[in-house]
């Protein structure tokens, strides 16, 4: 099945100017192009609130988005880690995505402006996200929420960070979030089509918005040294023990090179005892949650996100399966 023409046009508009730039040599240019192609166009119901969270000797900026009162899901908060390969993206370029997230879910959204590579390599961005998560989970009432109603959510590199934050919380004895939503996450350490165990790297790794080579380049900028490639907080799929993790929703994109590793991470979470739901969004490329205008894949994704947030925890965990239903 080929990607539909409307989706090709939408993705092309979203990534114009960035797809052919050498990210390793001109990452700052890619950041500038990303900001230019992701202006805030949506008007929030309420003015966002900028705040900072202490992390060691520095402060981490966060931006809080509040939903319309009539559509609000009382007490529910999404802690959002943006994508961009750990190298690009910020709370400004993701403002529209967060505004849409509040509209579509009724949740408050806290977006974390973690430090970016290569100026701040692994685990700097992860530590920022962990500090933000622990502060918000410990002080959820300050944000009008409760610890059990705080859900981690991240797309792409942000999905990687959300998974790693949950693992780190368990290992450090911190508060493990009750839920996490991983949107087309990066979970593995090898995206070479010749050596990767995942077929989607080969079938989807060329000619699309996100290529296998671009993923390898992002990881080269993110890691501090070669040893990081074997670190489960760098590549969560390498974790030997996935017990004690949150209830999880994994959403992947049909034509994404990261598709198979995201789904495999969901399956392993389920096998380790976490209640896990996996859904593959058809006719979609990587990064679809940021598409403007609510195209069908984005509406479908939010349908699953809302079902996940609404779902009663009383149901027993079942073996995870990949849903490939139509949009």
Region annotations inferred by a language model:
Residues 4-52:
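An N-terminal hydrophobic leader/cap segment in hydrolases
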Residues 6, 42, 47-54, 58-327:
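Alpha/beta-hydrolase superfamily serine-hydrolase fold, recognizing
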């Amino acid at each position: 099945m080929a990607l539909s023409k409307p989706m090709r046009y939408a993705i092309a508009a979203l990534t114009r100017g960035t797809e052919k730039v050498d990210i390793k040599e001109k990452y700052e240019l890619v950041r500038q192009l990303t900001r230019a192609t992701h202006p805030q166009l949506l008007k929030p119901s309420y003015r966002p609130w900028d705040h900072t969270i202490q992390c060691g000797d520095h402060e981490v900026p966060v931006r809080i988005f509040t939903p319309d009162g009539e559509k609000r899901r009382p007490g529910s908060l999404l802690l959002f880690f943006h994508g961009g390969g750990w190298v690009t993206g910020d709370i400004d370029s993701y403002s529209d995505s967060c505004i849409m997230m509040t509209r579509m879910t009724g949740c408050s959204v806290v977006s974390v402006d973690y430090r970016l590579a290569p100026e701040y390599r692994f685990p700097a961005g992860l530590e920022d996200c962990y500090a933000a998560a622990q502060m918000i989970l410990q002080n959820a009432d300050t944000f009008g929420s409760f610890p059990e109603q705080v859900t981690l959510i991240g797309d792409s590199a942000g999905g990687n960070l959300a998974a790693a934050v949950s693992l780190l919380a368990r290992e450090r004895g911190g508060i493990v979030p009750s839920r996490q939503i991983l949107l087309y996450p990066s979970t593995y350490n090898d995206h070479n089509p010749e050596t990767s165990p995942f077929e989607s790297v080969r079938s989807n790794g060329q000619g699309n918005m996100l290529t296998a080579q671009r993923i390898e380049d992002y990881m080269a900028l993110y890691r501090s040294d070669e040893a990081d490639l074997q670190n489960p907080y760098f590549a969560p799929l390498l974790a030997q023990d996935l017990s004690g993790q949150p209830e999880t929703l994994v959403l992947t994109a049909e034509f994404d090179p990261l598709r198979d590793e995201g789904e495999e991470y969901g399956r392993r979470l389920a096998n380790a005892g976490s209640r896990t739901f996996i859904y593959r969004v058809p006719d979609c490329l990587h990064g679809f949650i940021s598409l403007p205008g609510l195209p069908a894949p984005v509406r479908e994704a939010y349908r699953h996100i809302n079902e996940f947030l609404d779902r009663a925890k009383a149901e027993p965990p079942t073996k995870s399966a990949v849903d490939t239903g139509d949009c």
